[in-house]
Amino acid sequence: MTTALIFAGGTGRRMNSRSKPKQFLEMHGKPIIIYTLEYFEYHDDVDTIVVVCIREWIDELKGLLKRFGISKVSRIVPGGETGHDSIYCGLKSMKDICKKDDIVLIHDGVRPLITKQLITQNIEAAKKYGNAITSETARESIVRSTDGEIICEVPPRSQMYTAKAPQTFYYGKILDLYERAKRDGKKSIDSAHLCNLYGEAMHIVVSTPNNIKITEPADYYIYRALYEAMEGQQIFGL
């Protein structure tokens, strides 16, 4: 079985949106979280979806799922204090529906510009290599600093990538890593970072273009422009 774990537990402090969390902001009458969920809803290889959501917005999400015909969501789980905690909450809730060798795609609810092909590549790579980390080649030079003032390293750009999502794993393995982190008192930025903390080898799946995460106000307007450009290509054959 293949499960999509969508975490949408963030409050969106950097969006300056006082009325709604960022994942519930709408574009053309449809919330960002629904745009994201639709890719997994309509993918033949995804069997079920688990969503981690802000507790106070769970009822709102349930109504949206019904309104937009999202039927694969099998449960909605309250999120934690951090993204790490939210993913762990979701993984724990899946113990009764997932086997150790099932595939789980972990994806941001505010990353709606993925594709069917990217999901397929993640599933295939995870089955072959044990995991799949969607990554994008660096477009500019990356510098490293330990104190935020002095640059101590400029790695070759050809070797640098940005971790994106989905990040895909065998369920038993990724759950074990999160449980180890809990015992050790560790927190991670994302699942790829967690794998690195415990020395796990990771396999790259090259990201599709414009796989942005909507975090700040500018991201929303970039997303809207990109979405409308893609719509124009379909309509006008540009």
Regions found by a protein language model. Give the residues of each.
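Short aromatic/basic micro-patch
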Residues: E26, L113, T168, K213-I214
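Conserved N-terminal catalytic core of the sugar/cofactor nucleotidyltransferase
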Residues: I34-D101, K182-D184
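Conserved core of the sugar-phosphate nucleotidyltransferase
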Residues: L113-V205, L238
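Hydrophobic helical membrane-anchoring modules
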Residues: N211-L238
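Residue-level signal for inorganic ion chemistry
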Residues: I6, I33, G90, D108, ...
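N-terminal glycine-rich phosphate-binding loop and ensuing alpha1 helix
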Residues: T2-D59
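Short beta-strand-to-loop acidic/aromatic patch adjacent to the donor-nucleotide binding site
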Residues: C98-V110
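Hydrophobic packing residues within well-ordered alpha-helices of enzyme cores
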Residues: M15, F40, L61-L65, N122, ...
